[in-house]
């Protein structure tokens, strides 16, 4: 494999570029603070950004973790911002949602630690909701229930419904398991609803998600778009702005930026470009940039 890479100019270029990412991550000081979560009262919706695509969501009387990743390193890539919360400080978690099997979204050590923390604090493990054909990756982690959903299928948990929705991405964890599902989730309870897009490129499905489920708040990815071909599977800030307008949501919370150096745009660029795009679209007052670990109530 190494000899093949050295002989192939395209592979050699990619290896050189990846080496730059690794070196930049290694020498960049880790930033950010860890906080303790604030808990909701009076039926509020609570959103806590942990970093990357990870969120602690309080909705419908349930505590939900989405794509939890507390890793200090993603293989050779150093985490650039600390997780906003510690697993030990979490309240008992009812549900864990994982959007797809990629290593930065389905992080097995974090999932196992959440289960173990739940058993200590509550005596019962949480349930997990995943796309189709992903259960084998989480079956040994101790969850009380494993629920696989296909696109547009829903799972109900007392007053909370969770619907798995399409995205434009792919689900393989390694090269040979492209059968695995992928997508986003819409959580709805009473007057509150949240859409977590997972990983996705811009596509016409945003309009359909908005039309069918009308999410109040959209958690949308804005990073990992350079080189340009990455936009086949990721949204840049302009794409995320268009997606938000298609969804017709009230609030947008950006994610998938600044935590791991997954691509070649400057670390600070996604938020800077999002600010420009939001101003141009007249939605700046509806974009809420969350500090890791600081709970926002809606």
How does the language model describe each region?
Residues 44-46, 122-127, 192-194:
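Short active-site oxyanion
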Residues 68-71, 100-101, 133-134, 165-169, ...:
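Active-site metal-binding loops of divalent metal-dependent hydrolases
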Residues 46-49, 63-67, 161-167, 193-199:
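Active-site-proximal beta-strand elements of phosphoester/diester hydrolases
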Residues 57, 67, 100, 107, ...:
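Divalent metal-coordination and catalytic microenvironments
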Residues 21-42, 130-192, 272-294, 298:
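Metallo-beta-lactamase
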Residues 1-28:
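Membrane-proximal basic amphipathic "stem/tether" segments
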Residues 3-4, 95, 102, 126-129, ...:
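Cap/insert and terminal regions of metallo-dependent hydrolase folds
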Residues 30-40, 50, 56-101, 105-116, ...:
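Pre-active-site segment of Zn-dependent metallo-hydrolases
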